Amino acid sequence: MKHLLLAGLAALGFTSAATAQTGTLERVKARGELICGNHIALPGFGIQGPDGRWDGLDIDLCRAIASAIFNDPNKVKFVPTTPQMRFVVVQSGEVDMLARNATYTMSRDTSAGMSWPIINYFDGQGFMVRKSLGVTEAKGLEGASICVTQGTTTELNLADFFRANKLKYEIIGFATNEEGVKALEAGRCDAFTTDTSGLAAERLKFSKPDDFVVLPTLISREPLGPAVKRGDESWVALVKWVHYAMLNAEEFGVTKANVDEQLKSGNPEIKRLLGVEGKFGEGLGLTNDWAYRVIKHIGNYGESFERNVGMGSKLQLKRGLNDLASRGGLQYPHPIR
């Protein structure tokens, strides 16, 4: 009996170890699709169209990773998440990654059981008000009622700003951005606050968007990016290098339209990027043409930015900090070699 018990415990230990060693990529491959947590409805970043298709900058990142793994950008299951549940689904393993314009902070990095591979959008928190209010900058909101989404860094930044500037205000909390924006439109509060990219997106939903203005004041730094469950460094690396590949492609002028032609390029950096030379897919558990797949299906970072949130979109946001480092931005393409 003792020997049977020991054998059973050993087998159980072996099974647990095997399960622990089964990485995210292996589970994704076995399942046949990537599960990606995303925003419920944020134009430019994650929103579902009338035809049921999801689009946005964060959505493109999920599709890019699916392209790298499966050579098919549609092998993604999207799971819309609220601000209160977005990190829970990562920690529980319900999703393989979260791409939902979430802010990378110290506490989230050190105590939330998650890793943040990259920043795919550098932002800052601001305010949106009715033009008729006559306010031109944030300090003019003394005594104002502010709508904000509860359980977010946005709510904390709001309190910090008014306390630091010794201003009085009334906070009106909501479970989602959508509820807060509707309250602003209905006149239940004087201002709504979130990341400026989100303000630009939410403004588009108003029946009379020209009646509202986003104030120029930024009250915080908001590095936004995807999050994954901590403990699988290989998966962190895969997410990271898919983003870097899209940045490299933009740096070298490789686009969705010319990627096939670029396979003939004599530039050694482009050869490595597209898998013509070297075996840079092996370390990621991918084929060596993984980056070619990403660019062929999704395009480079600049293309994704422009069609979703840039001047080619309804949001018409400037690149700013999200431009390449070679043009004064913070998006720095790491070398593939």
What residues fall within each predicted segment?
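Sec/Tat signal peptide C-region and signal peptidase I cleavage site
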Residues: 16-20
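Extracytoplasmic small-molecule ligand-binding "clamshell" domains
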Residues: 22-99, 286, 301, 324, ...
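Bilobed "Venus flytrap"/periplasmic-binding protein-like clamshell domains
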Residues: 35-44, 54-69, 103, 123-179
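Extended ligand-binding regions for polar small-molecule ligands
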Residues: 60-63, 67-69, 131-135, 139, ...
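Acidic, polar ligand-binding/catalytic clefts
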Residues: 63, 67, 71-140, 197-218, ...
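C-terminal functional modules
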Residues: 280-337
